[in-house]
Amino acid sequence: MSDLLTGIKNYQQMFWQNPNKLSADEALARINFSFDDIFEAQKRLQRFAPLIKKLFPETENGIIESPLAEIPRMKQEIEKLYGGKIHGRLFLKCDNYLKVAGSIKARGGIYEVLKHAETLLLENGLITLEDDYSKIAEERFKKFFSNYKVAVGSTGNLGLSIGIMAAALGFKVDVHMSHDAKEWKKKILRDRGVNVIEYREDYSKAVEEGRKKAAAEKNTYFIDDENSRDLFLGYSVAALRLKDQLTELGIEVNKENPLFVYLPCGVGGAPGGISFGLKTIFKDDVYCYFVEPTHSPCMLLGLVTQKFSAIHVRDFGLDNITEADGLAVGSPSKLVAEIANILIDGIYTIEDEELFKLLALLKDSENIKVEPSAAASLKGPLLVNSRANAIHISWATGGIFIPEEIYREMYMRGKSYLKDVY
């Protein structure tokens, strides 16, 4: 462990196999979530589909889902870049194309906003579960929601998903943003009437202050990325949908055809919820790996030290400064760290420079636009020992909303780094 910690402290790229992982059945028996919870979340999203279709006509019948794309040319580019071999097929889960919010956070963030809205409406006798929820778009419901506020702390993408959906329903919205949040993300929110509160400190401080402010206000609901069960379950629904997508492609996951999934990790809610869903469905035939920046490996440190959320990367001399803004988190979620400890297969870390190289290669090889955080998932398939019939899925967490001029800068930066390699 001392070698591992030394490497982490020196900002080295590390690959860690989780020695505490239990079999899926053992782990799931100890976790305070069940398949029924995932199914309930899925049903709630289906109830809201008519409303989402009305508010966001660009969605497919009100279901916010992303394509699963095989990326054979990118597979070759990754092998060429790192001089290794990826055994099996490589797919990209394109949450960078998710409608409404443009990132993986559309799954958990939007789900929790909808659940809160439904709870308020049911408690006030304004709807029943059997109603056509498209009527919630009517002005009288917006007027009702305007008496309530939704708040969240975010480095960017979670704030976007919650801000966009809550504002569309009529809620007042506060988004507490850390110093690393990108200006263009703040602009999207302000353009929708969201109150953006900026901090000079990091993500943990933005969440702490947001939580404190919300607790002191009447009718304010704080979505707590560090501890939220609802966010976690919103993400877990992705596993049900991924299973359907694999079935449509004629892919059956089993012991002979294992599934490897690589998930960028900030505080841990999205990768944690998705891993829980995947392990619930595919059991020990799926292998889940998180990826973090070398400057912000909060989940890795939490699990390696077994201190879980009671650490900050600064405790280890790390600066928590990374271009992967969605992953710039100093302390992991308590809820997720304790689950990941017995559930996930491992974690690897990646340098910022690699993110830009992979971002540029993905654009050149497959014409797919992702943000740096999303590109982190692309190196994983090269690091694990897998067999020839493995299915690898790199989870692209965001990117479609990046303004073109900013994306162009990222792309050119990646190209300049690649010049030194090729």
UniProtKB/Swiss-Prot annotation:
Tell me which Pfam families the record gives. Answer: PALP (PF00291)
Report the EC code(s) recorded for this entry. 4.3.1.18
Key words, A-Z: Lyase, Pyridoxal phosphate
* The protein, known as: Probable D-serine dehydratase
Catalysed reaction(s) here are:
D-serine = pyruvate + NH4(+)
Q: Which domain of life is it from?
A: Bacteria
Q: Which cofactor does it need?
A: pyridoxal 5'-phosphate
> Hey, what's the signal peptide range on this chain?
none
Q: Name one GO molecular function term.
A: D-serine ammonia-lyase activity
Q: According to the UniProt entry, which residues carry N6-(pyridoxal phosphate)lysine? A: 105
Q: Which organism is it from?
A: Carboxydothermus hydrogenoformans (strain ATCC BAA-161 / DSM 6008 / Z-2901)
Q: Could you tell me the Gene Ontology terms of the biological process aspect for this record? A: D-serine catabolic process; isoleucine biosynthetic process
The text of the family note is: Belongs to the serine/threonine dehydratase family. DsdA subfamily.
